[in-house]
Structure formats: structure tokens, C-alpha cells
Amino acid sequence: MQNNTTGMDTKSLKNCGQPKAVCTHCKHSPPCPQPGCVTKRPPVPPRLYLPPPVPIRQPNTKDIDNVEFKYLTRYEQHVIRMLRLCNMYQNLEK
């Protein structure tokens, strides 16, 4: 603590127990002696949330044999799968 006080006696300069941001009466030394009081430090930027990467589903080998298969709508792909299950797809190709 400094001995050359400007207009205040040393009793009023003692730590009053208030946090530094609240107290205007006493002059805290820069490292605040009170635990848990407000200190002046640059604000930490908030972390941006990065969603986890979505795993890309690899097409089956039977999906690859038809090159245009991935350009069809989901319903058309479903119909083709159902026809393959019924073993009718090979008959329709002939």
C-alpha cells in the first residue's frame, strides 16, 4: 500500500470487503485480495458449436451396378429395391 494518500486517511483505503467493481470507496491493489471478486480481463470469445460430422453411407455393390441409381428419387430407389427383393427386376430388364 502506498503511503502518499491523496486527501484520504489510510483507514478509508483499507479493503472494505466489497468486490472491486462494486466498491468505489476503497482502492484495491490491482490483484484483488478478495477471492471471487470481479477482475478486469479481456472477455473470452464464445466457442462456436461444431456439430459432429455426419458419416456418409457408402452405397452397396448392388447400388453401384446401376449408374443412374443415385440420381433417382428415394421412392424410385425403394421401388427398385422391392422389385429386386421379389426377383422381378432381372425379368423386367430382359
Swiss-Prot record:
Q: What induces it?
A: Its expression is regulated by host RBM38, probably via RBM38-dependent splicing of the viral pre-mRNA.
Q: Where in the cell is it found?
A: Host cytoplasm
Where is it mainly found?
host cell
Using the record for this protein, list the coiled-coil segments as residue ranges, or answer none.
none
* One GO term of the biological process aspect: symbiont-mediated perturbation of host apoptosis
**Keyword field:** Host cytoplasm, Host-virus interaction, Modulation of host cell apoptosis by virus
A Gene Ontology term for the protein's cellular component: host cell cytoplasm
Repressor recorded as keyword:
no
Q: Does the keyword 4Fe-4S apply?
A: no
State the protein's purpose.
Enhances viral DNA replication and virion release. Mechansitically, optimizes viral DNA replication by interacting with host GRB2 to inhibit the negative effect of ERK signaling on B19 viral replication. Plays a role in viral infectivity. Induces apoptosis of primary erythroid progenitor cells.
How is the quaternary structure described? Interacts with host GRB2; this interaction alters host cell environment by modulating host signaling pathways.
- State what protein this is by name: Host-modulation protein 11K
Q: What is the lineage of its organism?
A: Viruses, Monodnaviria, Shotokuvirae, Cossaviricota, Quintoviricetes
Gene behind the chain = 11K
